[in-house]
């Protein structure tokens, strides 16, 4: 009797272990890395991801500061302090508005920087063409 119980439990553990091992291996070999995900994105989405990376990092740092402050306080966990409750509509709307403003400011700054670079490039090309024309033309020659 006892051997059949051990045999059954052995089968159960073997079946469970094989299911778990299969899941782990499938997860490991079918989940793309971050680099592969970025490579698969369209150029517009990849550019947007790169633009918003700093914003996400700043948001994460702010969250970590709030977590550190909450951890140091003696208040219960449900008293979130500076973190807005997800059930408060006015707080989350203000946060969303602030996030959208920051995002718009960042996009505007990047667009201005891109325009400045294009203008500098055009200015340099114009100067090069002007120098080339001046060097070819002899202004003091009569013929």
UniProtKB/Swiss-Prot annotation:
Q: Which UniProt keywords apply?
A: Chaperone, Coiled coil, Membrane, Mitochondrion, Mitochondrion inner membrane, Transmembrane, Transmembrane helix
Coiled-coil region(s): 99-131
Q: Which GO terms describe its biological process?
A: mitochondrial respiratory chain complex III assembly
Query: So where does this one cross the membrane?
Result: 5-27
Its GO CC terms?
mitochondrial inner membrane
Top-level taxon of the source organism: Eukaryota
**One Pfam family name from the record?**
CBP4
Location of the protein in the cell: Mitochondrion inner membrane
| Entry membrane topology | Single-pass membrane protein
Family named by the database record: Belongs to the CBP4 family.
> Which purpose does this protein serve, as stated in its record?
Essential for the assembly of ubiquinol-cytochrome c reductase. It has a direct effect on the correct occurrence of the Rieske protein, core 4, core 5 and apocytochrome b.
Protein's recorded name: Assembly factor CBP4
Name the encoding gene, please. CBP4
